[in-house]
């Protein structure tokens, strides 16, 4: 009996070291060698300073910027999660109605029937950095007007920031809001010169 306990303890310790230390360090090393940008969180830098991750959405409330999806967790990556409200839950409809009204208020001239679901509903993680191209195009008029840019210029920024389907098959075309807003910032700087 004592021999079995010793063997069990040794087995446990060996696997704790292998799976708790060796494996994570080896995988981290491989990730840093093969995918250094992604391994470090896909951090986007401007003038050498981090401004965000292309993997985590940010809250843009200023009308000068394209807004992203609503977040059930206020874009807090430490408490990722969606609302988990069922379609039959009155709170879901209250939240949806509030988001629709807010979007319509910020984007006059947009019809309720034109609003895509992604811009008024939070994602499952509450941290989605992407919106649909349609959601971006619906904001072009407001963003162009507030920034004093021609609508066509802002529309082209959206066009340039559309990411296609993964491997041409999976998912839907999407726009990373942070990248789009950084492109917009560059365009604003160009027009001020």
UniProtKB/Swiss-Prot annotation:
<comment type="function">
    <text>Part of the high-affinity ATP-driven potassium transport (or Kdp) system, which catalyzes the hydrolysis of ATP coupled with the electrogenic transport of potassium into the cytoplasm. This subunit acts as a catalytic chaperone that increases the ATP-binding affinity of the ATP-hydrolyzing subunit KdpB by the formation of a transient KdpB/KdpC/ATP ternary complex.</text>
</comment>
<dbReference type="GO" id="GO:0005524">
    <property type="term" value="F:ATP binding"/>
</dbReference>
<keyword id="KW-0812">Transmembrane</keyword>
<comment type="similarity">
    <text>Belongs to the KdpC family.</text>
</comment>
<dbReference type="Pfam" id="PF02669">
    <property type="entry name" value="KdpC"/>
</dbReference>
<keyword id="KW-0630">Potassium</keyword>
<keyword id="KW-0067">ATP-binding</keyword>
<keyword id="KW-0472">Membrane</keyword>
<keyword id="KW-0406">Ion transport</keyword>
<keyword id="KW-0633">Potassium transport</keyword>
<keyword id="KW-0547">Nucleotide-binding</keyword>
<feature type="transmembrane region" description="Helical">
    <location>
        <begin position="11"/>
        <end position="31"/>
    </location>
</feature>
<keyword id="KW-1133">Transmembrane helix</keyword>
<protein>
    <recommendedName>
        <fullName>Potassium-transporting ATPase KdpC subunit</fullName>
    </recommendedName>
</protein>
<comment type="subunit">
    <text>The system is composed of three essential subunits: KdpA, KdpB and KdpC.</text>
</comment>
<dbReference type="GO" id="GO:0005886">
    <property type="term" value="C:plasma membrane"/>
</dbReference>
<keyword id="KW-1003">Cell membrane</keyword>
<dbReference type="GO" id="GO:0008556">
    <property type="term" value="F:P-type potassium transmembrane transporter activity"/>
</dbReference>
<dbReference type="InterPro" id="IPR003820">
    <property type="entry name" value="KdpC"/>
</dbReference>
<keyword id="KW-0813">Transport</keyword>
């Amino acid at each position: 009996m004592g021999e079995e306990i010793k063997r069990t303890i040794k087995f446990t310790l060996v696997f704790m070291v292998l799976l708790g230390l060796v494996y994570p360090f080896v995988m981290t090393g491989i990730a840093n060698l093969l995918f250094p940008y992604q391994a470090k969180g896909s951090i986007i830098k401007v003038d050498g300073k981090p401004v965000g991750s292309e993997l985590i959405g940010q809250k843009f409330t200023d009308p000068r910027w394209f807004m992203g999806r609503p977040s059930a967790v206020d874009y807090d990556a430490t408490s990722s999660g969606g609302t988990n409200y069922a379609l039959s839950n009155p709170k879901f409809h209250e939240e949806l109605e509030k988001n629709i009204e807010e979007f319509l208020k910020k984007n006059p001239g947009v019809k309720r029937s034109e609003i895509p679901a992604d811009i008024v509903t939070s994602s499952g993680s509450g941290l989605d950095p992407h919106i649909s191209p349609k959601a971006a195009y619906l904001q072009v008029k407001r963003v162009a007007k507030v920034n004093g840019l021609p609508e066509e210029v802002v529309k082209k920024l959206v066009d340039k920031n559309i990411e296609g389907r993964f491997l041409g098959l999976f998912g839907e075309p999407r726009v990373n809001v942070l990248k789009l807003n950084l492109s917009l910032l560059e365009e604003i700087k160009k027009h001020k010169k």
